[in-house]
Regions:
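Conserved N-terminal entry element of GNAT/NAT acetyltransferase domains
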Residues: 1-16, 151
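Active-site rim helix/loop that mediates acceptor-substrate recognition in acyltransferases
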Residues: 31-54
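Conserved beta-strand in the GNAT
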Residues: 54, 62-71, 81, 86
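Active-site beta-strand termini and strand-to-loop segments that position acidic
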Residues: 56-58, 146-148
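Conserved active-site alpha-helix within GNAT-family acetyltransferase domains
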Residues: 62, 98, 110, 122-140, ...
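A conserved beta-turn-beta hairpin within the catalytic core of GNAT-like acetyltransferases
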Residues: 72-82, 92, 139
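Conserved hydrophobic beta-strand within the GNAT/NAT acetyltransferase core sheet
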Residues: 82, 116-120
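Conserved acetyl-CoA-binding loop-helix of GNAT-fold acetyltransferases
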Residues: 87, 93-106, 133
Length: 151
């Protein structure tokens, strides 16, 4: 990472600091409520398929960004998805989104490479510009969603 004021580390265990930071960053990512508690965070971090990377501002020690890499195998091949890309409002405009995406690209290369996929709403103009500037190409596809209630 080129910027000496920031450091990226994989989150390996759930703790109060990580939980508070994830809650704060999720609130900045979406207006939709994302319930997050210690149990859920622990399950996510314990999963071999989910890698959460945290961006820390070294001078303050504050976690100011995150990115999630989801990876799993299917009959059609290895899938690697980028999710939950967010930089704290106070640290935006410094190229840190690029830094997180480049870090994940490097991690995927270490895992054997392959396609790196993500989705982004068209209304997120800055995010879409970021992804395109990193070499992501828009695919023509439909994404469908079905809400299934719990029993």
């Amino acid at each position: 990472m080129n910027n000496n004021e920031y450091q990226i580390d994989r989150a390996l265990e759930a703790n109060d600091e990580t939980l508070a930071a994830v809650r704060n960053l999720l609130a900045q990512l979406s207006t939709k409520e994302h319930p997050m508690d210690m149990e859920l965070l622990s399950r996510i971090l314990d999963s071999e398929c989910t890698l959460l990377y945290l961006l820390r501002h070294i001078p303050t020690g504050e976690i100011v960004g995150m990115i999630t890499l989801g990876t799993y195998s299917l009959l059609t091949g290895q899938k690697r998805w980028v999710e939950d890309v967010v930089i704290d409002n106070a640290h935006r405009g410094k190229g840190l989104g690029h830094t997180l995406l480049q870090h994940v690209r490097s991690e995927v290369a270490k895992l054997g490479g392959g396609s790196l996929l993500l989705t982004s709403r068209p209304s997120r103009v800055a995010a879409n510009h970021l992804y395109q500037s990193e070499g992501y190409q828009r695919r023509e596809t439909n994404v469908y969603k079905l809400e299934v209630p719990a029993e």
